């Protein structure tokens, strides 16, 4: 079994826990998630299995979509409801429209200080482990981008919003910063990931449903193929001979490409090499594609 299973992660499990459950259910040795989702969060968690794990570095998960709910009046050390309150403030003087204006202003390119309770590492040690000992270390601010943000509802002190943002954005930190700007503190109470790159809730299933489908031998409908997951890459179809050549680790010749499909591809284009719709390799095109027989593509990853 090769590809991706999109899990609708439940509250309380770590991303590692989910991968372990998938590995056990599918009896797969090779499995891994494409990006951590906080234990208190729910929603889209793509898990690669088999040859799908080779595709992870080449996925386009540059855009993620979340629905979040924050509560005004308290900031916590984790920036969510699982932490300890470190600051409390009065929100009762705030008008819904002023809250809407502030929350809606968190769009565009923003500078964000990663939270101490995160998986980022300092000298090889995850920051959350240092935070649990009471230590706080300097972190570099990071540029993130919020492509869009819509306030769904305001029922003070609760505010629910949906946002589309760049990879690496901490929605917890956005909520914290919103609370600071409003002067009363805030933290997340709910976070649900609606999509991550090509993976969305429409394809997501629960761990319980995964077990049912596995026992029935009916996983084909929920398995996202590596080719579909890499659909953002230019497709280059190979002949049978070309696919065999690539599987042996050799770049294809012009004759190995079907119907002259390799012509006109700009240098630096990342490609998925296909045979009968199945990914054989990921490669980069070099300057002057097909200017010679064997050095027009640089193979990055070959799939079995």
Curated annotation (Swiss-Prot):
Q: Which reaction does it catalyse?
A: uridine(55) in tRNA = pseudouridine(55) in tRNA
Question: What Pfam families is this protein classified in?
Answer: TruB_C_2, TruB_N
| Enzyme type, top EC level | isomerase
The record's Gene Ontology biological-process terms are: mRNA pseudouridine synthesis; tRNA modification; tRNA pseudouridine synthesis
The GO terms describing molecular function are: pseudouridine synthase activity; RNA binding; tRNA pseudouridine(55) synthase activity
Transmembrane segments annotated in the record for this chain: none
Q: Does the keyword tRNA processing apply?
A: yes
**Annotated InterPro entries:** PsdUridine_synth_cat_dom_sf, PsdUridine_synth_N, tRNA_psdUridine_synth_TruB, TruB_C
Q: Which residues form the active site?
A: 38 (nucleophile)
Report which residue ranges the record marks as coiled coil.
none
Keyword vocabulary terms for this entry: Isomerase, tRNA processing
Q: What is its EC number?
A: 5.4.99.25
The UniProt family comment states: Belongs to the pseudouridine synthase TruB family. Type 1 subfamily.
| Protein task | Responsible for synthesis of pseudouridine from uracil-55 in the psi GC loop of transfer RNAs.
Supply the name of the protein.
Answer: tRNA pseudouridine synthase B
**Species lineage, top-down?**
Bacteria, Pseudomonadati, Thermodesulfobacteriota, Desulfuromonadia, Geobacterales
């Amino acid at each position: 079994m090769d590809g991706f299973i999109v899990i609708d992660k439940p509250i309380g499990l770590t991303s590692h826990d989910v991968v372990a459950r998938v590995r056990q259910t599918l009896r797969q040795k090779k499995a891994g998630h494409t990006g951590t989702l906080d234990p208190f969060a729910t929603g889209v968690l793509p898990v690669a299995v088999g040859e799908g794990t080779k595709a992870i570095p080449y996925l386009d998960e540059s855009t993620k979509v979340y629905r979040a709910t924050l509560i005004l009046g308290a900031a916590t050390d984790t920036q969510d409801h699982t932490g300890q309150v470190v600051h409390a403030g009065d929100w009762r003087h705030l008008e819904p429209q002023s809250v809407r204006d502030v929350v809606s202003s968190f769009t565009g390119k923003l500078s964000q200080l990663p939270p101490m309770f995160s998986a980022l590492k300092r000298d090889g040690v995850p920051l959350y482990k240092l935070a649990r000992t009471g230590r706080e270390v300097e972190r570099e601010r990071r540029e993130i981008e919020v492509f869009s943000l819509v306030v769904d509802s305001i029922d003070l002190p609760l505010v629910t919003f949906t946002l589309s943002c760049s990879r690496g954005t901490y929605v917890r930190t956005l909520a914290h910063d919103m609370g600071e700007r409003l002067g009363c503190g805030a933290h997340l109470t709910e976070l649900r990931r609606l999509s991550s790159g090509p993976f969305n809730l429409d394809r997501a299933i629960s761990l319980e449903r995964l077990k049912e489908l596995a026992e029935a031998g009916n996983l084909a409908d929920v398995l996202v193929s590596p080719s579909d997951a890499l659909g953002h890459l230019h497709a280059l179809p190979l002949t049978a001979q070309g696919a065999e050549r690539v599987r042996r680790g050799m770049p294809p010749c012009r004759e190995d490409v079907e119907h002259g499909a390799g012509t006109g591809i700009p240098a630096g284009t990342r490609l998925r090499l296909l045979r009968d719709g199945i990914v054989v390799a990921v490669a980069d095109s070099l300057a002057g594609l097909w200017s010679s027989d064997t050095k027009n593509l640089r193979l990055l990853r070959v799939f079995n």
